[in-house]
């Protein structure tokens, strides 16, 4: 636990009792590992949410993170490979659908999804190295 008047702004543990909408797929915690989440539940006064997690190689050939859905806010999604020799190498293939258009990506990337635009599913295939995932949007709590 951090001390001081601003310690409440430092988050270093996963969000306890996190609740997610039904379109978020529950994954094996040995493979998809939450790091931290900033939102109005974890940081008083937060005006946005940001969620981070590691996605690790495992037994499954495919991991689905979410089904198709929309938000009333824009969302940034980022996926970054863990290859020191080539930081652009994702170490997997990610299929992300945005507005019914499928994109297959094998490089580290970010995507912005405008408010009201359908996105998902997000499917990760052939993971050979850890992937750092971040998502963020201008909403106090992810819904």
Descriptions of predicted regions:
Residues 126-143:
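A short hydrophobic beta-strand segment most commonly corresponding to one strand
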Residues 1-66:
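A short, N-terminal "cap"/entry segment at the start of jelly-roll beta-barrel domains
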Residues 74, 82, 115-117:
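Short, flexible loop/turn elements at secondary-structure junctions
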Residues 61-77, 89-91, 98:
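A short beta-loop-beta micro-motif enriched in histidine and acidic residues
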Residues 79-106:
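A short beta-strand-loop-beta hairpin characteristic of the jelly-roll/cupin
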Residues 102-125:
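Conserved metal-binding segment of the jelly-roll/cupin
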Residues 83-85, 118-120, 139-141:
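Short Gly/Pro-enriched loop/turn and capping motifs at secondary-structure junctions
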């Amino acid at each position: 636990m951090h001390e001081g008047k601003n310690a409440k702004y430092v988050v270093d543990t996963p969000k306890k009792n996190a609740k997610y909408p039904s379109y978020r797929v529950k994954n094996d915690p040995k493979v998809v590992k939450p790091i931290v989440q900033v939102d109005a539940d974890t940081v008083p006064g937060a005006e946005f949410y940001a969620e981070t997690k590691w996605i690790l190689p495992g037994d499954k050939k495919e991991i689905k993170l979410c089904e198709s859905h929309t938000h009333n806010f824009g969302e940034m999604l980022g996926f970054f490979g863990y290859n020191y020799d080539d930081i652009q190498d994702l170490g997997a293939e990610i299929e992300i659908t945005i507005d019914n258009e499928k994109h297959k990506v094998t490089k580290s990337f970010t995507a912005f999804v405008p408010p009201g635009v359908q996105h998902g599913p997000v499917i990760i295939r052939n993971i050979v190295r850890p992937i750092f995932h971040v998502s963020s949007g201008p909403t106090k709590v992810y819904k």
